[in-house]
Design a protein with these regions (language model features):
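Beta-propeller fold detector
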Residues: 231-249, 288-295
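Short loop/turn segments that connect beta-strands within beta-propeller blades
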Residues: 226-228, 282-285, 321
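Blade-level signature of beta-propeller repeat domains, shared across WD40, Kelch, NHL, RCC1
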Residues: 302-321
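Repeated scaffold domains used in trafficking and secretory/extracellular systems
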Residues: 156-163, 171, 175, 191-205, ...
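Short loop/turn and low-complexity linker motifs enriched in small/turn-promoting residues
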Residues: 1-196, 218-219
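Loop/turn residues immediately N-terminal
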Residues: 55, 95, 217-220, 274-278, ...
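Hydrophobic beta-strand positions that form the internal "hydrophobic ladder"
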Residues: 212, 268-269, 308
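Predominantly a core beta-strand signature of beta-propeller blades
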Residues: 127-130, 229-230, 285-290
Length: 321
């Protein structure tokens, strides 16, 4: 085999050297998080942080399954994403799906924190009365006669009923105070209070004390109670842009009968409206997820820990989430 001519070797050397030196900047750009954009210009990539509270949830990005959450690992970070719009879908069998459209900007990380509500949550009716397991028996002429005792009120039913009464009184006080704060001219001198300020009284405060809720008519509003510098993404539009301390969460055509935070969440609110109880997220990026918890006739609710107590007409239902 004859050796390659010197001229040819030099040619290959120069070509390969040129390729090598051209590739170095491209590799540096790539390692620094830059990619070739749609307009053939270099753009810095971003990422998205995704969290699902339920283990066994399937996470989809633009229709492609990218992860399934485990018992301990419930969050996932996707990096090296070109700027643009992405759709996130999180689903789990027997739960309502959660979806969100997220915009990724250059060098920014977007957040998508889901909530998943069971389609058929466990529930049981709290009886009004304690039924006698064994009715009293007396012997009459060799025959057994059964005597029924007067039904005894169920203490648990009465306790829960009193909680609903307390909730109703508290709501009426808050609504009245906020109405007067908004329209001080409506307050008569006899009912005026020297300690009253223009600040609203919050009907509910989130579990971690970060968000306050109140209503104006049928509109639900939320206020961030911590430092303005720490406003979370769900008080902002897009990637922490146009952030506001006070935002409107929901505007109902019907009366909102009950209002509270979803257990353990600062960013999910539960409302009773029309014939149902629903969870709605504060995050208004499309789509603002709205998931049913209970459907009945005319329900009210209170929350104790992770238990929902629903009062629908005379019935009280205990629902575990």
């Amino acid at each position: 085999m004859q050796p390659m001519p010197l001229k040819k070797r030099r040619f290959y050397f120069y070509v390969l050297s040129l390729v090598f030196f051209l590739a170095i900047p491209a590799l540096i750009f790539y390692e620094s998080g830059y990619r070739l954009g749609d307009s053939f210009n270099f753009v810095k990539t971003g990422g998205i942080y995704i969290y699902s509270p339920e283990s066994g949830s399937e996470i989809y990005l633009n229709g492609d399954k990218i992860e399934e959450t485990g018992f301990f690992l419930k969050d996932f970070f996707v990096d090296d994403l070109k700027p643009g719009k992405y759709s996130v879908l999180i689903s789990k069998e027997k739960f309502w799906p959660w979806a969100k459209n997220v915009t990724i900007k250059e060098g920014m990380v977007a957040e998508a924190i889901a909530f998943l509500i069971p389609k058929d949550p466990e529930g049981e009716t709290v009886p009004k009365n304690i039924e006698e397991a064994n009715p009293a028996e007396t012997e009459t002429s060799g025959k057994t006669a059964t005597t029924k005792k007067k039904p005894e009120a169920n203490p648990e039913y009465l306790r829960i009923l009193s909680l609903f009464e307390e909730e109703k009184i508290n709501k009426e006080k808050v609504v009245k105070s906020n109405t007067l704060a908004k329209n001080p001219a409506d307050e008569s001198p006899a009912t005026s209070s020297p300690e009253k300020t223009e600040e609203y009284i919050y009907e509910k405060v989130s579990p971690r004390g970060k968000v306050g809720l109140w209503r104006e008519g049928n509109q639900i509003l939320a206020k961030w109670l911590k430092s303005d510098r720490s406003l979370p993404y769900y008080f902002c539009e897009g990637n922490n842009e146009n952030c506001r301390e006070i935002i409107a969460i929901f505007n109902s055509a019907s009366v909102v009968r009950s209002l509270d935070f979803y257990p353990g969440r600062d960013d999910v609110v539960v409302i009773a409206v029309e014939n149902g109880i629903f969870a709605i997220e504060i995050d208004s990026r499309k789509t603002q997820n709205f998931q049913p918890i209970y459907k009945g006739v005319d329900p009210y609710f209170i929350i104790d820990g992770n238990t929902f107590y629903v009062k629908d007409k005379d019935a009280i239902i205990k629902i575990k989430i």
